[in-house]
Each structure stands twice: as C-alpha cells, then as structure tokens.
Amino acid sequence: MIENFNDNFREICLNLKIDKRRFILGLSGGIDSMALLSLLKHFIVSNKNLKIEVFPVIIDHDLRLNSSNEAKAVQNIALSLGFNTIIKKIITKKPNGNIQNWARKERRRILCDIAFEFSANLILGHHSDDLVETIFMRSVKGSGIEGLRGMQDRMIWNDTLILRPLIFFKKRQIINYVNSNNVIFFEDQSNFLLKFERTRVRKTLKRISVSNWPSISNDIIKFSLLNKQLLLKINKI
C-alpha cells in the first residue's frame, strides 16, 4: 500500500500542477486518518526533495466526555512523528437533530479556513467505502449526476484544494496497513450507532453484498466514474 500511495500522492504533487507544497491534514484520530498520517510520514521521508509540509489539525467536536483527552492523545502521537499539530475545539451551539451532518460541515469549514490561513491544500482520509456509502445515500434521496459522482480525489471548495489520496483504497486495505504497521488509532463508538444514517447504510450495503450482490461496491464505484466522465463531457458542451 505504501508504494501505491506514494505513486498516487506523487502524481498529485507533480502531474496535477499543484503549486502549494503545504498541506493541512484533517486528523480525527480514527483508523483512516491515522493511517494517512503514517503514510504521509513515510512519503515525506522518502521524498525530501519535494519539501512537503504537513500540519495535522484535530477538530474536537466536544460531543463526548473524553473528547479533549482523546484529542490531546492524538496530538501527542502526531508530535512524536515530527508533525506540528493544532487542536481546534468547536464552540458553536450544537443542533438538536442530524448531529453528524452538523459536525461534518463545521469540521470542513474550520479545516478550509485554516488551510486558507496557511495558504495550504487540505488532505482528508476518505476511502472508497466512504465513496460507496455516500453515493448510495444520495441515490436514495434522488440526487442528480453531480451528486452521484460522489467524493473526488481532488476538488475545490471555498477556494481551497481538497485532496483525498486514499479514495481509491478500500477500508480493508487500510485495516491491513494499520495492523501490519502497528498504527495507533482511536475508535469512535458513534460509528456503530444505528441512529446515524451512515451506520445504517453501511450495514445495508454489507447485507446486500453478502446476500445477493457481492459486487455492489465495485459497481457503485464504476457508476461514480461514469457520472464523472459524463459531467466532463457535459461541461465541454
């Protein structure tokens, strides 16, 4: 996985004409972002000539009693790897409903603001399973072509370039990497609560895959790529 990641990230840096070599990393402490932190460390060491700077930013949503302690523990791990790390605590009033959607929007807003302040790009740890879940949720809600394209490996949002170098990797690949390299991470128990839509969708996709459609994830990814190609053609008209 390290070699594939290096090839992917090097292509992003060199072939996509990215001028900035400074990156803000959204670091939650979960398995995906901690794997990405480890991979970035390896990439930086292996490509010193690129002079890459990465600044992890930990968003403390203040939704759990131990969130501050966990954020500090994640910061200490990042510091031990040589990364200057920032903790930002969300102090705005929490909504009564759809807390996950609120947290996602607040997190992205804060990260993009920091990236703009640092004149940096933003790196997020989304993987292909996240992409599949997102497209599935949007399809149920009747989303159009652009929505059914799903998350992209690179996109512009509020003048900030957002990169997702793990978007073509499956969750099981990330788990294998973490286990093989003894990467420390923190499990957010809310990921298993059925009151959240994404958790329910994840379980539904697994049930469909096991019962009668084992290729559903790959088929949804192909569907995403087809929508991306269609949008490119439409935009040329």
Where are these regions (language model features)?
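Flexible helical/loop "lid" subdomain adjacent to adenine-nucleotide binding pockets
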Residues: N121, G125-I237
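ATP-dependent adenylation/nucleotidyltransferase module used to activate substrates
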Residues: M1-M137, R172-Q173, N179-S180
